[in-house]
């Protein structure tokens, strides 16, 4: 039933993939080839889907959110390229394919990530949205991805290796490393639609919860998943001696926390009076997915 409902997002997904995969041309340069390699590696596109679906569910024009969604996916992809490098997570596979530095080389992978990060902001500048909204979106994206957002979360994650973290410390890592871009995806819809502060705050609550749920589910899949489904080595977090929700709480308690966060999220979403269930369905997919 859930998969049937998700077919509503197929048009959005096709639009996102078409926009992403037409940005860089592998024949143009080795750099473009490396960028396109990672962009075309078959990700779930959760972040841009959240942008478009939130707009759609709240009565906005989903197409207005496409440039911001593409920018988010570019920054997310750059972060994965860099995270996989030997100096950080030292992973050989991502999404079932060789990681960028394994397929090309470390220097090319670093430059591919650098280019994606830089080009992402150009996506927002090239939109037809008014200047005030563009500035707000650039502020949202830079805050979510920079030294107080995703990059900060990655630093905390590295510092937390080979340590037993408290639950609060673990949540702090994932609010920043995983959660900030997901929060930005959902909040961007409110900025584009000129929501008031109270409405934006509800989107912030939803976005924060969805970000945490995404990570809790990833930690569960690191135990229960398979290489075929998740596209990376099962148990890699345990092998790297990283604290996870499962290692701190246990599997069943992690699943209960996931369900509790989902209930909170549904309650916050109701206050915004969505015109359809598309966002609720996508959030449910994030919690119930097997990859």
Curated annotation (Swiss-Prot):
Name the GO cellular-component terms.
cytoplasm
Q: Where does Mg(2+) 2 bind?
A: 83, 89
Q: Does the keyword tRNA processing apply?
A: no
Cofactors, names only: Mg(2+)
| Compartments, record wording | Cytoplasm
Q: Which PROSITE patterns does this entry report, sorted A to Z?
A: POLYPRENYL_SYNTHASE_1, POLYPRENYL_SYNTHASE_2
Output one GO BP term: isoprenoid biosynthetic process
Q: What's the Enzyme Commission number for this chain?
A: 2.5.1.10
What does the record give as the reaction this protein catalyses? isopentenyl diphosphate + (2E)-geranyl diphosphate = (2E,6E)-farnesyl diphosphate + diphosphate
Q: Give the matching InterPro entries.
A: Isoprenoid_synthase_dom_sf, Polyprenyl_synt, Polyprenyl_synt_CS, Prenyl_diphosphate_synthase
Q: Which UniProt keywords apply?
A: Cytoplasm, Isoprene biosynthesis, Magnesium, Metal-binding, Transferase
What would be an example GO MF term here?
A: (2E,6E)-farnesyl diphosphate synthase activity
> What's the protein called, per UniProt?
Farnesyl diphosphate synthase
Q: What is the lineage of its organism?
A: Bacteria, Bacillati, Actinomycetota, Actinomycetes, Micrococcales
Query: What would be the name of the gene that encodes this protein?
Result: fps
């Amino acid at each position: 039933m859930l998969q049937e409902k998700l077919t509503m997002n197929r048009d959005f997904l096709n639009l996102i993939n078409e926009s992403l995969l037409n940005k860089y041309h592998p024949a143009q340069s080795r750099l473009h080839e490396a960028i396109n390699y990672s962009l075309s590696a078959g990700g779930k596109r959760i972040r841009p889907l959240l942008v478009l679906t939130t707009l759609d569910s709240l009565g906005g024009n989903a197409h207005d959110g496409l440039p911001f969604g593409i920018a988010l996916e570019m920054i997310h992809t750059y972060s994965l390229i860099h995270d996989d490098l030997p100096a950080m997570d030292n992973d050989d596979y991502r999404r079932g394919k060789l990681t960028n530095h394994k397929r090309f080389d470390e220097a090319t992978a670093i430059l591919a990530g650098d280019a994606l990060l830089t080009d992402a902001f150009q996506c927002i500048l090239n939109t037809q949205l008014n200047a005030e909204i563009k500035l707000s979106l650039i502020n949202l994206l830079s805050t979510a991805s920079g030294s107080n957002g995703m990059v900060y979360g990655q630093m905390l994650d590295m510092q937390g290796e080979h340590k037993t973290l408290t639950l609060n410390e673990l949540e702090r890592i994932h609010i920043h490393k995983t959660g900030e871009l997901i929060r930005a995806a959902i909040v961007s819809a409110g900025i584009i639609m000129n929501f008031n502060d109270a409405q934006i705050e509800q989107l912030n609550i939803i976005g924060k919860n969805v970000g945490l749920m995404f990570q809790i589910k990833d930690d569960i899949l690191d135990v229960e998943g398979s290489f075929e489904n998740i596209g990376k080595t099962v148990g890699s977090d345990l092998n790297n001696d990283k604290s996870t929700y499962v290692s701190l709480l246990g599997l069943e308690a992690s699943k209960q926390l996931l369900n509790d966060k989902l209930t909170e999220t549904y309650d916050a979403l109701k206050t915004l009076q969505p015109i359809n269930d598309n966002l609720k369905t996508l959030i449910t997919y994030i919690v119930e997915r097997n990859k």
